[in-house]
Each structure stands twice: as structure tokens, then as C-alpha cells.
From Swiss-Prot:
Cofactor binding annotation: Binds 1 zinc ion per subunit.
Species: Streptococcus sanguinis (strain SK36)
Alphabetized InterPro entries for the sequence: Cbl-indep_Met_Synth_N, Cobalamin-indep_Met_synthase, Met_Synth_C/arc, UROD/MetE-like_sf
Pathway(s) annotated for this protein in UniProt: Amino-acid biosynthesis; L-methionine biosynthesis via de novo pathway; L-methionine from L-homocysteine (MetE route): step 1/1
Binding site for Zn(2+): 636, 638, 660, 721
Gene giving rise to this polypeptide: metE
Catalyzed chemical reaction(s): 5-methyltetrahydropteroyltri-L-glutamate + L-homocysteine = tetrahydropteroyltri-L-glutamate + L-methionine
Cited function: Catalyzes the transfer of a methyl group from 5-methyltetrahydrofolate to homocysteine resulting in methionine formation.
GO biological process entries: methionine biosynthetic process; methylation
Keyword DNA-binding: no
UniProt keyword terms in alphabetical order: Amino-acid biosynthesis, Metal-binding, Methionine biosynthesis, Methyltransferase, Repeat, Transferase, Zinc
Active site, renumbered: 689 (proton donor)
Sequence positions that bind L-methionine: 425-427, 478, 593
Required cofactor(s): Zn(2+)
Protein's name in the database: 5-methyltetrahydropteroyltriglutamate--homocysteine methyltransferase
């Protein structure tokens, strides 16, 4: 038996890649300096994996932005609008991810979507009629050669052709099958070149195999792989899956002439059952036994019990998915040993994989004994009062009265807003000064009084600016908040916060998910102080801004000793208390963000309701079920696909929902119309994830497109997400255009 991992975090132990890349974006360093820093980081990471005793080390799991974008770039899947720009390869690569606005042209970024059921986001490639699939990049070869210079023969990793097609968009008139032959040729060229460089095995990531597969999709996969594997160019091929089991394709997959198959024994409900039914003796099984998504220590006895049931002769122990979904290392944390011992970040998971391998081979007695002792000790007690409150919930606690249609009429009269009301999603740019003041306050270098004065000044400035520009519903800007989940978690019992537990979310953006350690209750009012203050500074309505229970759960590292449903209900009651306090303080519009609602949606449709939506949607309703009819409840969602769960979203019974739509060309609106969606909607009219400012007329055209599909009385005008990470000049310029476009559109309604 040997050991490996599917992939390793990219940003660095202290987010070195993020800070270096952002310097490049600000033109403070050259492309050569960026590439040199990245090379140094890769060497450091390979060395860590090697020193931990992992026998197979992956390469090309590193990315300057996103691994799906890397694959698209490698195979020349680049839209003609970007191909035509006179840019360097690196500039073109970043133009796909971030858009480009300069003397050489003006192009929007490609869309961004959630990577399966994680909080990682990938850039969505687009296959056009003009797309000429061919081997065009060299990153995968460069990184293999780099590692070889360090004495390491790595296993190169690339997104497999089936998943590349499944996660991409296609221009009208072309389909995935049109690109099969060209992709086969291009991938085989990669095989040949890697074999020439001295590679022995390539990892083709095919997580799309764990989803429900139609007969057409299965046929596409088999057509691709039969052609691809007809000539492997002397390279061994590992088809690596993760995030679930491959029940729909297993029988065909094991018959293909692949050399190895990677299966997920953590999230794959049926994986063990499938392999117990038979696994070919001539293939190697890469067994994903250590959870790549959560930060809790592996229970060695449970993992060993699973491994003992696997009939395969050749097994490589690995992570259940890439370790990019967990923080780098616990070494920089300051928790008490009694707490820290329960956590394993990426580096520690290398130890776990190595330990399990050693125990399987007759060693590791000390590691096994320590692990048994850890799991034999009670970790945390229960909150009896909270458990009783949950046990006492009835159907009435999940139902808001009167019904939506009656509330809508009441709210229109009470709020008296113009048609196409304008607002933003919540946060305004957090400048260096804002972050520095927060840090100084946290360190005790700034008094509470001085910090409060600074925050009040920020709120005053932006409330005044919103009034001057002409916004109808204002926000206070969230200057007191570091992260939309961490800020709430810091005011809830049962939460722990890492010092350096950063995880890549999209591009160079990292998030630091809090850890749910025990039962969750609200310690004190969280947002009332600043929401009330902001409302006191204006006669216009100011939205109270909360993060919803499902998003707080999904953007935290959840407990594994109770169900995520039970954890979510605990959080829902805490947020419910906050909603009622905001209402009592005179806040008439309360936004409860559920940005991550879709994130934990099972990958198989048959599991959607029973395993998730049947409790996630009621948990949201529990939060707002007892507010008055004239209190308007908003929610917001971003980065996701919703067209297939629209009835469930309507069932959240919010009064208004805003969502990311600009990058996806407002496709969701057709489905809203088809499904007779009742909730008022604010489709994002411009993309905030790119620094470009919408052109004059751009937002006008977007509003026109929205009004062609949604009745004007149901439409709100807003950006597609919060503005925390954007710069002030681009933010103000974009928002002025948004308000001007909304006012112009109102004239056409009359």
C-alpha cells in the first residue's frame, strides 16, 4: 500500500500567493516576479508533502486562479472576445477570470459557479462555434519539470475531459459531443509530452461522475474514454472521483482500460457497497478515506474498519477530495491542546494518511492508541434549555401569516417606495483604513469609544452618499464586520475561530470558516446597535443585515457528532432572536442572506428534499415566521445555480430575493416566469466580482431585459453581491450608473 493526496492548498501557509498576486494586479510587481514567487511556493509545498512521507506527490494541482480555468486555457477553450485581445498569456488568463478594461479592449469576466457542493468557485469555460480545441498551454509540463528538478517524479493532475465538458457553457448551435474527438487528441498530446518528460501516471479529475448521469451523459463519458484510452502514450491513467459515489457508471468504469480509479469513501454513500461487489485485480484503487472537506481528526478505528472490507489488492490511501477545502496547518493556531488535538488541517491530514498506512502495515501502534484515547473522551456537553426549545417547535413556528400576497400589499403601502426600488446588497468597500482600525481595536490599541466613533463616521458618510445619489433603500455598509459568518459566530456560543484557518473561495479570495464546537445560542444582540444608528441618520428605510442559518452552517466547519439539521436549527433560533430585536428597534426591512443555500444540496436529485431542502427551507422560515406583516424580509443568494430549485426558494416565503445573475445573462428569469415565482426579485444588474465599471447603457439594457420577463411591480434594482472587496472609485461609479438607469427605466413605465 502507498499514500497520496488528490491536491494540496494553493494560497500558501500565510496566503503568500494571494498577497503576491494582488501586488501584480496593482502593477506593483512584474509578471516575472509573480511567476517566480509561485514557483518558490510550489517547491515549498512539494517538500512538505514529501517530508510527511507521502509516497505519490501530485503536481499541477496548483493554480494562479482556478484549476478549471487552467484546463480551459491548456486546451484553448478561450472565447473569441478574449482571443482577439493583444495580451500576454498571463494577461489573457486573468482577463478570463476577472475581465479586462483598458487600452487593449473591454471584456467581461467569464461566469463563476460553485464547485459541486463546496464553497470553492470555478470559472465556467465557454465552448463556442469558433473554439478550436488543441493543446495550447504548457503549465502542466512546466510544473512537472520543476518538481523533477527537485528530485520528485510527481503525478500531474488535470480536470478530466468529461468533467470539463459537464461544467462548461456552450454557445447555441454547439454541444459537448462536437468536441469529443478534438479533446481526445489534445489530451493524448498531454499524455505523450508528459511521458516524454518522465511522468509515469496522470490524474484525470472526474467528479462529474458522482452526479446523476443520464443515458446520454454515460454514452458521452464512454465515448470519450474509449477513444482516449486507446492510446495512453505509455502513461498510466488514474480516473479520480470525489464528493460522492459513482453508482451510475461504476460497472462501466471498472471495465475501461484505466490503470487506477479513485473513489470517495467519506461522502460516497454507496462506494463501499460498490467495491465489495468487485474491483478488478489489474487496477489500483485510490481509496479516499481521510475527509478533505472538514477539519476534525480522522477516527482511525472507523477508517480501518472500512479499509478492511475493501477487496481490492492494490490500494493507495488518499484524501476524499483535494485538501484545498481545508486550512493549511494547525501549527499556527493558539487553541488549548485539549481543543487543538481534535483538529486536522491539510498538513495534519498528511500525517493521518501516513498513520493509517502504517497501521495497515502492522506499525503505528502509538498513533492508533493516541487516536483511540482522543475519541474515547467526551468533547463537549449539551445545552439542555436549547435542546428543549427545539423539541418544543411546532408547525406554526415555521409558518408566517398572513400569506405573501396580503403582506406584499401591506408593505407597498407602508414603505411607499417608487417602482423599481434601488438598493445594494449590504456591504461597502472595506478600505485599508477600515481594516487597520478593526485590527487596532482587536489588538487593544484602539479604545471602544474611538472605534465606535470611526464606525459612526463611516456610516454617516455612506448614508449621506446613498441619499445624494438617490438610493431608495439604504444600507449601513457593514464596516464593523470582518466576514459575514465570522462576525455572527463571534456572538454565538459554541463557536471557535482559527487564527490562520484560511481556505480558498474564489481566485485569490480566502475565507476563514469558523468551527462549530458545541451547541449554538445567541450571547447578546449582534447587529441592533449599528442598524439602529444608521436608521437614525436618515428618513429613508435602512436594511438590517443578517446572515441566515443555512449559510452560517454551510460556511462553517460543522460538527460531526450531531446532524447538520440539528446544528442549523440551533443557529436559526439564535438568528430569530436577532430578527425580533431588530424589528423591535424600528427596522422595517431585514435582509437575511442565504448566499450558500445551495452549497450543501446533495449532488443527486433524489436526495435533494429528504436529505436537505425539507429541513433547510423550514429553518429559514423559522427565523422570520413571527415578524409583523409590514416588516419586509429580504434574502440574498450568490454564485449559484437556482433554476432547478425555484419552487423551494419561493417556499422560503421571503418578501424579496436578490441574486447573482449578471454573469449568467439573467438565465434564471425565464425559469422564474415559467414557475410562476411569487417573491419580488432583485436580479443583479452588474457583476461586482470584476473591477470593471459597467459601460453607459449597459445597466439600462440589463433592466430592459429583466422587465421583459418579470412584472415591474416585482422588480428591485441592485448589484449582484456585496461590495466589500471592491475599490471605492469603481463602486461609486457603478452605483451612480445603477441609480441613473433605474430612474430612466421608471420613465418608460409611465
Amino acid at each position: 500500500m502507498s499514500t497520496t493526496i488528490i491536491g494540496f492548498p494553493r494560497l500558501g501557509e500565510f496566503r503568500e500567493l494571494k498577497f503576491t498576486t494582488e501586488k501584480y494586479f496593482r502593477h506593483e510587481i512584474s509578471a516575472e516576479e509573480l511567476l517566480a514567487a509561485a514557483k518558490e511556493l510550489r517547491a515549498k509545498h512539494w517538500n512538505i508533502v514529501k517530508e510527511k512521507g507521502i509516497s505519490e506527490i501530485p503536481s499541477n494541482d496548483f493554480s494562479h486562479y482556478d484549476n478549471v480555468l487552467d484546463a480551459a486555457f491548456l486546451f484553448n477553450v478561450v472565447p473569441s472576445s478574449v482571443q482577439g485581445l493583444e495580451l500576454t498569456d498571463l494577461e489573457r488568463y486573468f482577463a478570463l477570470a476577472r475581465g479586462y478594461q483598458g487600452e487593449k479592449g473591454d471584456v467581461r469576466a467569464l461566469p463563476m459557479k460553485k464547485w459541486f457542493n463546496t464553497n470553492y468557485h470555478y470559472i465556467v469555460p465557454k465552448f463556442e462555434k469558433e473554439t478550436q480545441v488543441k493543446l495550447a498551454g504548457h503549465k502542466i509540463f512546466d510544473e512537472f519539470a520543476e518538481a523533477k528538478e527537485l528530485g520528485l517524479v510527481t503525478r500531474p493532475v488535470v480536470v478530466g475531459p468529461f468533467t470539463l465538458l459537464q461544467v462548461s457553457d456552450f454557445e447555441d448551435g454547439v454541444a459537448p459531443a462536437d468536441f469529443v474527438d478534438a479533446l481526445v487528441v489534445a489530451y493524448q498530446e498531454v499524455f505523450a509530452k508528459l511521458a516524454e518528460l518522465g511522468a509515469e501516471r496522470i490524474q484525470l479529475d472526474e467528479p462529474s461522475l458522482v452526479k446523476d448521469l443520464s443515458a446520454e451523459e454515460k454514452a458521452l463519458f464512454l465515448d470519450l474514454y474509449k477513444k482516449l484510452l486507446a492510446d495512453k502514450k505509455g502513461l498510466e491513467v488514474l480516473v479520480q472521483t470525489y464528493f460522492g459515489d459513482v453508482r451510475d457508471i461504476y460497472a462501466d468504469l471498472v471495465q475501461l482500460p484505466v490503470d487506477a480509479i479513485g473513489l470517495d469513501f467519506v461522502e460516497g454513500k454507496k462506494t463501499l457497497e460498490l467495491v465489495k461487489g468487485g474491483f478488478p485485480a489489474d487496477k489500483t484503487l485510490y481509496a479516499g478515506i481521510v475527509n478533505g472537506k472538514n477539519i476534525w481528526r480522522n477516527n482511525y478505528e472507523k477508517s480501518l474498519a472500512v479499509l478492511e472490507q475493501i477487496p481490492a489488492e492494490n490500494i493507495v490511501l488518499t484524501s476524499s477530495c483535494s485538501l484545498l477545502h481545508v486550512p493549511f496547518t494547525t501549527a499556527n493556531e493558539e487553541f488549548e491542546p485539549a481543543i487543538l488535538n481534535h483538529f486536522a488541517f491539510a498538513v495534519e491530514k498528511l500525517d493521518e494518511i501516513r498513520d493509517l498506512d502504517a497501521i495497515r502495515n502492522g506499525g503505528g501502534a502509538e498513533a492508533l492508541a493516541a487516536n483511540k484515547e482522543l475519541f474515547a473522551t467526551e468533547r463537549v456537553g449539551e445545552n439542555a434549555e436549547l435542546r428543549a426549545r427545539i423539541a418544543g417547535l411546532t408547525d406554526a413556528d415555521y409558518t408566517r401569516l398572513p400569506v405573501f400576497a396580503e403582506r406584499e400589499e401591506i408593505q407597498h403601502k407602508t414603505l411607499n417606495l417608487p417602482p423599481l426600488p434601488t438598493t445594494t446588497i449590504g456591504s461597502f468597500p472595506q478600505t485599508k483604513e477600515v481594516r487597520a482600525k478593526r485590527l487596532a481595536f482587536r489588538k487593544g490599541e484602539l479604545s471602544q469609544e474611538d472605534y465606535d466613533k470611526f464606525l459612526a463616521e463611516q456610516i454617516d458618510e455612506w448614508i449621506k452618499w446613498q441619499e445624494e445619489v438617490g438610493f431608495d433603500v439604504l444600507v449601513h455598509g457593514e464596516f464593523e464586520r470582518n466576514d459575514m459568518v465570522e462576525y455572527f459566530g463571534q456572538n454565538l456560543s459554541g463557536y471557535l475561530f482559527s487564527k490562520n484557518g484560511w481556505v480558498q473561495s474564489y481566485g485569490m479570495r480566502g475565507v476563514k470558516p469558523p468551527i462549530i464546537w458545541g451547541d449554538v445560542t445567541r450571547l447578546n444582540p449582534i447587529t441592533v446597535k449599528w442598524s439602529s444608528y444608521a436608521q437614525s441618520r436618515t428618513d429613508k428605510p435602512v436594511k438590517g443585515m443578517l446572515t441566515g442559518p443555512v449559510t452560517i452552517l454551510n460556511w462553517s466547519f460543522p460538527r460531526e457528532d450531531i446532524s447538520i439539521k440539528d446544528s442549523t436549527l440551533q443557529i436559526a433560533l439564535a438568528i430569530k432572536d436577532e430578527v425580533l430585536d431588530l424589528e423591535a428597534a424600528g427596522v422595517k426591512i431585514i435582509q437575511i442572506d442565504e448566499a450558500a443555500l445551495r452549497e450543501k444540496l446533495p449532488l443527486r436529485r433524489s436526495d435533494w428534499y429528504e436529505d436537505y431542502l425539507d429541513w433547510a427551507i423550514p429553518a429559514f422560515r423559522l427565523v422570520h415566521s413571527t415578524v409583523a406583516p409590514d416588516t419586509q424580509i429580504h434574502t440574498h443568494m450568490c454564485y449559484s445555480e437556482f433554476t432547478d430549485i425555484i419552487p423551494a426558494i419561493d417556499n422560503m416565503d421571503a418578501d424579496v430575493i436578490s441574486f447573482e445573475a449578471s454573469r449568467s445573462n439573467l438565465e434564471i428569469l425565464d425559469e422564474l416566469k415559467a414557475k410562476n415565482f411569487q417573491t419580488e426579485v432583485g436580479p443583479g444588474v452588474y457583476d461586482i466580482h470584476s473591477p470593471r465599471v459597467p459601460n453607459e447603457g449597459e445597466i439600462d439594457h440589463t433592466i430592459e431585459a429583466i422587465l421583459a420577463k418579470v412584472p415591474s411591480k416585482k422588480v428591485w434594482i441592485n448589484p449582484d453581491c456585496g461590495l466589500k472587496t471592491r475599490g471605492i472609485p469603481e463602486t461609486k461609479a457603478s452605483l451612480v450608473r445603477l441609480v441613473e438607469a433605474a430612474k430612466a427605466a421608471r420613465q418608460h413605465l409611465k
